[in-house]
Amino acid sequence: MRETPKKVLVIGSGPIKIAEAAEFDYSGSQALKALKEEGIETVLVNSNVATVQTSKKFADKLYMLPVVWWAVEKVIEKERPDGIMIGFGGQTALNVGVDLHKKGVLQKYNVKVLGTQIDGIEKALSREKFRETMIENNLPVPPSLSARSEEEAIKNAKIVGYPVMVRVSFNLGGRGSMVAWTEEDLKKNIRRALSQSYIGEVLLEKYLYHWIELEYEVMRDKKGNSAVIACIENLDPMGVHTGESTVVAPCQTLDNLEYQNMRTYTIEVARSINLIGECNVQFALNPRGYEYYIIETNPRMSRSSALASKATGYPLAYVSAKLALGYELHEVINKVSGRTCACFEPSLDYIVTKIPRWDLSKFENVDQSLATEMMSVGEVMSIGRSFEESLQKAIRMLDIGEPGVVGGKVYESNMSKEEALKYLKERRPYWFLYAAKAFKEGATINEVYEVTGINEFFLNKIKGLVDFYETLRKLKEIDKETLKLAKKLGFSDEQISKALNKSTEYVRKIRYETNTIPVVKLIDTLAGEWPAVTNYMYLTYNGTEDDIEFSQGNKLLIIGAGGFRIGVSVEFDWSVVSLMEAGSKYFDEVAVLNYNPETVSTDWDIARKLYFDEISVERVLDLIKKEKFRYVATFSGGQIGNSIAKELEENGVRLLGTSGSSVDIAENREKFSKLLDKLGISQPDWISATSLGEIKKFANEVGFPVLVRPSYVLSGSSMKIAYSEEELYEYVRRATEISPKYPVVISKYIENAIEAEIDGVSDGNKVLGITLEHIEEAGVHSGDATMSIPFRKLSENNVNRMRENVLNIARELNIKGPFNVQFVVKENTPYIIELNLRASRSMPFSSKAKGINLINESMKAIFDGLDFSEDYYEPPSKYWAVKSAQFSWSQLRGAYPFLGPEMKSTGEAASFGVTFYDALLKSWLSSMPNRIPNKNGIALVYGNKNLDYLKDTADNLTRFGLTVYSISELPLQDIETIDKMKAEELVRAKKVEIIVTDGYLKKFDYNIRRTAVDYNIPIILNGRLGYEVSKAFLNYDSLTFFEISEYGGGI
């Protein structure tokens, strides 16, 4: 008999960080849906304001609080749930669940853990317990020993024998893990590894050099029935974190014996931890014989399970939630197929490729080599019917300016064979580009295998693409058969046109004349063997007919956000999903085009039709040819839609909302600056970078510092503050590289100004706007800034002038839909610095803070007009809301932590409060590794900017109970100083509770900042924020823990 709980608490994962991203928005949303179907009341704790999950429609009650045990205890005390789900919020949620269990909170309030129990979680996540469990069950694991101290680690590594893989228990994204080739390597890094473990434990394991890494996804119910859902093959060998690896599904190089043996072991691993729900099991396979080891398991929804779910069409998170409620596999219907029960193992008639997306160029000093720690910030997934087609599509999806395996910047560079092999040996990101270059320059398969350990099967495929492309280049014209073969191998129109030295339009014309167009295929989990009710599709040239009939009517295609990177994250998926829902009121059919496996928008039951495919002019035009969409919406998915808007419009596509020509004016720095001059709106002095002579003259006239700003970029890519001529010339060179087709603008950088923004919606005549004020001064990228609603320091007069400016721009550009305007305010003058004619990164926050969905309002503005009498309307604020940035410094090996005009954060959290400090502190505490400092500990406060704020910060921290030191080389008035060496020593000894600093001081304090983030010590990189947070510490006892609607927020 199944006992259904009446109220269930679901723990989210908090803000997006490297290794814990939007996959938990997807999995948590599915879990909440599964609970709702059962009539169960749901309560969600999650501080990630950007997610779809933290919209009211998913959970009955939402608490936007730090995802830590003491905050969750307050919710349990108030809500009294019967059950708790901790398997849908990543490692963060599991850690909270274990803490609540150990501290007796679950027992005290009689809350039952649903799904895999705590002892099973501990068996899986403690490296020592996992090893013991596997050995007890006669399951093969590599030779290894655990350790809980530096001395024990050094002793046990000698027993295991070098090289050793250091694995970290209860850990996220391999943080702190490494391969130690010698004792010296181990001694240098073992303290950091132990610091990154939630329980202070590591495993020293024999390093399996160049072994193949594989993952299996398994479902298991309370009766022990199991179904293996996917086998995923990592192309990168052991030693590269699976989140950093290019992977394919189904596995391509296993024989039946290998596949079946590991499948059996997977089921045994699930049984040994008494899994209820879903887990993934990772294996190492000897490429030269039938020898395999079990490496680890994650007893929760994970990045891999999100990928497996999207790759197979099997709704893992939904089914897992049902199993946690006590269902058996045969009782749950697979909602994607609509025909089969959850015990059916999927069958695939296509190949899926996942490639991670890195943004390492944004960080100074970061280690560029891929290793055991995850550094990628997002991923893409492509679907094709040949490996070549799937791989080339995935490379284009990365949006890194490469058209596929061949024909791009790397392939056409002057790099020699030796240089390409060197990059491959160093494990640089996007290895397939260097492999293709090496083959082009004459490298053999064996030479590339020796430096990479990548299976020869895949290397042969890449070499085949190189050979085909070189043959293509020798042709003057292309015949129908060669063109069809090229398309089947995944070549884009752009690649083919480059090879033939023709235009893209020429290739498209021949394609249409020869009827060489892709066909639409369904993902149904059943390889077409059973009829299915799915709406989940992709396009391929390896097919002869479409799997669907295309409907007529008033139809909308929404362009998704693509793969996440710094600057494009889950907030744009929120916009896409909001637009889907709003659009269904105005269109007969709404479809979405996206290729991110982590997101809610690519879930099977969100869109009427989901096209899991490339976002490009070529693909959109192909889809319009088939589907006859009346409109295409490019404004909800971040920069990627805006980048193709103008070209789509030039090809006859009707854009929803603001015109492509208006978007071009906003995105092109020179055109936008001229528009502001025409309207008489204040902006910093500027010049378009046409010659070095003019730039030099301008800089001398306005004085340094100046800001270098490329066009059509996101997250401040290559945006730099230049303090000298030398820096100016270097930054202009970089900016023209990143955005060569568009002008680079140099403007006067206004120091010590307040930065503010308006998120808004217009119908071309009226404006609905929300004002956000930054705590940090102008010069810190808005994506890294802490934001407050309502504003605090701006005067009403300034805000009214900002609103007036916005209204004038909206009317001049005939803005129809969402937009965001950024201002700097100095001496009572607001200066406009940027306009984005699309949904903004802050829109989920501003919408939830005010209780009004700006994307829904956008659709009303476009079709019905805004329905208020004023020209400009801002909804009133009922309470305070504060948004904080989440940084992932600890994952980015070697990176120097500092803030500037280029974005560095990976996610965001928000909280609400009855006072500004109530909201600020909960918001700040929601970002890892921030915590309330232990009184009687040490704080370091120093810097070369915002010195008055740093001094006041030091005073506040002293009042809080900390011993505060400044550094003698950068003293603060009346604050005790220590020298730099002593400061480093205190940080390494983990005696420092918090660091507050400001300014770019890499030559001086690199070791202090880097060691702090390696050891999980909270660090605040701005004096103004440090002051406000330190003041909030003094009000710690008055924090409130209300449900979001009690603060008047939520949508």
From Swiss-Prot:
One of its GO terms (molecular function) is carbamoyl-phosphate synthase (glutamine-hydrolyzing) activity. ATP 2 binds at residues 709, 748, 750, 755, 779-782, 822, 834. It comes from the Archaea. Residues 1-399 are annotated as: Carboxyphosphate synthetic domain. ATP 1 binds at residues 127, 167, 173-174, 206, 208, 213, 239-241, 282, 296. Belongs to the CarB family. Residues 131-325, 673-863 form the ATP-grasp domain. This is Carbamoyl phosphate synthase large chain. The gene is carB. Its EC number is 6.3.4.16, 6.3.5.5. Pathway: Amino-acid biosynthesis; L-arginine biosynthesis; carbamoyl phosphate from bicarbonate: step 1/1; Pyrimidine metabolism; UMP biosynthesis via de novo pathway; (S)-dihydroorotate from bicarbonate: step 1/3. Mg(2+) 2 binds at residues 296, 298. Mg(2+) 4 binds at residues 834, 836. Large subunit of the glutamine-dependent carbamoyl phosphate synthetase (CPSase). CPSase catalyzes the formation of carbamoyl phosphate from the ammonia moiety of glutamine, carbonate, and phosphate donated by ATP, constituting the first step of 2 biosynthetic pathways, one leading to arginine and/or urea and the other to pyrimidine nucleotides. Mn(2+) 2 binds at residues 296, 298. It comes from Saccharolobus solfataricus (strain ATCC 35092 / DSM 1617 / JCM 11322 / P2). It catalyses: hydrogencarbonate + L-glutamine + 2 ATP + H2O = carbamoyl phosphate + L-glutamate + 2 ADP + phosphate + 2 H(+). Keywords: Amino-acid biosynthesis, Arginine biosynthesis, ATP-binding, Ligase, Magnesium, Manganese, Metal-binding, Nucleotide-binding, Pyrimidine biosynthesis, Repeat. Composed of two chains; the small (or glutamine) chain promotes the hydrolysis of glutamine to ammonia, which is used by the large (or ammonia) chain to synthesize carbamoyl phosphate. Tetramer of heterodimers (alpha,beta)4. PROSITE patterns: ATP_GRASP, CPSASE_2, MGS. The large subunit is composed of 2 ATP-grasp domains that are involved in binding the 2 ATP molecules needed for carbamoyl phosphate synthesis. The N-terminal ATP-grasp domain (referred to as the carboxyphosphate synthetic component) catalyzes the ATP-dependent phosphorylation of hydrogencarbonate to carboxyphosphate and the subsequent nucleophilic attack by ammonia to form a carbamate intermediate. Residues 549-930 are annotated as: Carbamoyl phosphate synthetic domain.
